[in-house]
């Protein structure tokens, strides 16, 4: 193997390591975003269970609308996490 070929192989290996590291970080971030979303949904569920909210139709309607927004956002976060996990798994298979 020539020096040029060896240098190319080293660069290729370094890029692969950097890509793997970036994918692992993306998975960690996506997982944290899901956890944060779950906490937000749980906190909003507690708010909706208070007498102040459920006894007031306007507040209850606004809370229900916000709850649905939080649930939709959580679903998007789960999809992002799943996509990140799949990308990492594919990269690990091709290693």
Where does each model-flagged region fall?
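Charged, heptad-repeat coiled-coil alpha-helices that serve as long linker/dimerization "arms"
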Residues: 1-95
């Amino acid at each position: 193997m020539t020096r040029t070929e060896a240098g190319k192989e080293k660069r290729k290996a370094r890029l692969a390591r950097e890509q793997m590291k970036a994918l692992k970080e993306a998975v960690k971030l996506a997982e944290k975003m899901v956890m944060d979303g779950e906490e937000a949904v749980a906190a909003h569920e507690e708010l909706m269970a208070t007498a102040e909210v459920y006894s007031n139709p306007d507040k209850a309607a606004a809370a229900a609308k916000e709850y649905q927004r939080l649930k939709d956002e959580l679903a998007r976060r789960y999809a992002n996490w799943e996509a990140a996990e799949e990308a990492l798994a594919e990269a690990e298979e091709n290693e």
